[in-house]
Every structure is written in structure tokens, then in C-alpha cells.
């Protein structure tokens, strides 16, 4: 236990929280350019071809971003918006692509949960 005198001389250092999304620099989203668009396989026990993109952000970071939804129009040099949020079965993927923003089209066939996929309300 520190004495009062010791605490006056050198106060206690506050604990620093480590962020799960360092590339965002405390911003809600960041813009970037796709350097590579490809599929990868999840870890056990899951099996699929998950669509991901390697993205060069405006702040110089290069990160891997997951492309959610069925089908996408992304290719190399597409400009996209990324947000935080990891993909549990893809190691190293800590970011999600925002659908319906910049060059990334929304998911046309979406009827429910549309806002997360950039889909407009269908004409009934």
C-alpha cells in the first residue's frame, strides 16, 4: 500500500483499455480501397466460403473486412466503408464492410433486416 506522500509525488496511473478495432482510430467508420477480394474458409467446426476483402484505409492501415449478405459487387480498387465488428469463425477478421455505402451495393433480395444490408424497402 502506497503512503499518502508517495501518491502525492507519483499518482496512480489509470488503466488503459485496449481497443478491439485499432485501425478505426476511435472513429465509427473508415473509408478504404479494396486491394484484394477473395474467399476464405472458417475454422472448425464450420464450413463455408466466406467473402472477405483486404482493404487499404485512408489512415494507412491495411485490414481484412468481411462482406456480409448474399452476393456482392466488390472488386479490386472498389472504395468501401468499413465498421468494427469481428467475425468469430474467421481469425484475423475484425471489421465488416458497410453494405449500401460508397461502391458497395446493398443486398437486393433482402426483405427482413434490411437496414444492415443497405436494402431499400420493396414496393408492396
UniProtKB/Swiss-Prot annotation:
Pfam families: Ribosom_S12_S23. One of its GO terms (cellular component) is small ribosomal subunit. InterPro entries: NA-bd_OB-fold, Ribosomal_uS12, Ribosomal_uS12_bac. Keywords: Methylation, Ribonucleoprotein, Ribosomal protein, RNA-binding, rRNA-binding, tRNA-binding. One of its GO terms (biological process) is translation. Signal peptide: none annotated. The modification 3-methylthioaspartic acid is found at residue 89. The keyword Repeat does not apply. Belongs to the universal ribosomal protein uS12 family. This is Small ribosomal subunit protein uS12.
Amino acid at each position: 500500500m502506497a503512503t499518502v506522500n508517495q501518491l502525492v509525488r507519483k499518482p496512480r496511473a489509470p488503466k488503459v483499455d485496449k481497443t478491439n478495432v485499432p485501425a478505426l482510430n476511435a472513429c465509427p467508420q473508415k473509408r478504404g480501397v479494396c486491394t484484394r477480394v477473395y474467399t476464405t474458409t472458417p475454422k472448425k467446426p464450420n464450413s463455408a466460403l466466406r467473402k472477405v476483402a483486404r482493404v487499404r484505409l485512408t489512415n494507412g492501415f491495411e485490414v481484412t473486412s468481411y462482406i456480409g449478405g448474399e452476393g456482392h459487387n466488390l472488386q479490386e480498387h472498389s472504395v468501401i466503408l468499413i465498421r468494427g465488428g469481428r467475425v468469430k469463425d474467421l481469425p484475423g477478421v475484425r471489421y465488416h464492410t458497410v453494405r449500401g455505402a460508397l461502391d458497395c451495393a446493398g443486398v437486393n433480395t433482402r426483405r427482413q433486416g434490411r437496414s444492415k444490408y443497405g436494402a431499400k424497402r420493396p414496393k408492396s
